[in-house]
């Protein structure tokens, strides 16, 4: 049910269509020669949807939460700890060099240190393209465009994510009531006219 969170949260870096790394929250980053210290510079123009600025403290908080087992979002077992050097600089100390770190950071959504708690999943605050408007548990999530998003404006003002079984999802696409639907390879031959099949493996 948390499929919507990548739309709500921003990441340090992202990957483009060619899987090359591009900056998101980071404006610059680099690694020490021994591969044990990564330094990320963070944008200064990013706000969470509650109006609080996003800083390197939030980045360190998010990474340390995963490292310490408080969030099981990604495998950061190669990381020792993260720390905010100042408001716009975060250092990540590694246990050992690891070339998968950037790929992992490209999917780790940064959460607000000041507002993260047990009920965060129900009322997420992020800095991404969208913000939560409504969540009907087990049925749907309604998102609306974040007017303060720092990047290019989203192409859709509103997104409704319906939670349904694969057959129902395909039927919704076939009837024209869904713009996007997930299906497995077994049903790939049933893609309705006007839709494009994307391999997201």
Question: What do these predicted ranges mean?
Answer:
Residues 1-33, 64, 125:
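N-terminal lobe/hinge region of extracytoplasmic solute-binding protein
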Residues 13, 17, 47, 64-71, ...:
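Sec-exported extracytoplasmic/periplasmic mature domains
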Residues 16, 20, 97, 103-154, ...:
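Gly/Pro-rich hinge or "lid" segments in bacterial periplasmic/extracellular proteins
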Residues 17-18, 34-35, 43-45, 59, ...:
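Solvent-exposed coil/turn segments that connect beta secondary-structure elements
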Residues 28-70, 91, 172:
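Aromatic- and charge-enriched surface segment that lines or borders ligand/interaction sites
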Residues 34-37, 41, 74-115, 134:
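Surface-exposed binding/hinge segments that line
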Residues 76, 189-200:
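Ligand-binding "clamshell"
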Residues 118, 147-191:
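Ligand-site clamp/hinge motif
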């Amino acid at each position: 049910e948390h499929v919507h969170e990548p739309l709500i949260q921003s990441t340090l870096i992202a990957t483009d269509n060619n899987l090359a790394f591009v900056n998101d929250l980071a404006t610059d980053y680099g690694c020490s020669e021994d591969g044990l210290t990564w330094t990320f510079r963070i944008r200064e123009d990013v706000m969470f949807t509650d109006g609080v600025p996003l800083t390197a403290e939030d980045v360190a908080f998010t990474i340390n939460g995963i490292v310490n087992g408080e969030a099981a979002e990604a495998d950061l077992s190669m990381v020792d700890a993260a720390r905010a050097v100042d408001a716009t600089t975060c250092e990540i100390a590694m246990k050992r060099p690891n070339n998968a770190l950037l790929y992992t950071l490209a999917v780790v959504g940064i959460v607000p240190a000041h507002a993260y708690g047990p009920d965060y999943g129900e009322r997420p605050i992020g800095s991404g393209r969208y913000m939560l408007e409504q969540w009907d548990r087990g049925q749907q999530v309604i998102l609306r465009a974040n007017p303060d998003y720092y990047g290019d404006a989203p192409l859709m003002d509103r997104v409704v994510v319906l939670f349904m079984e694969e057959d129902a999802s395909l039927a919704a696409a076939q009837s024209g009531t869904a713009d996007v639907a997930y299906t497995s390879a077994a049903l790939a031959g049933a893609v309705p006219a006007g839709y494009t099949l994307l391999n997201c493996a």
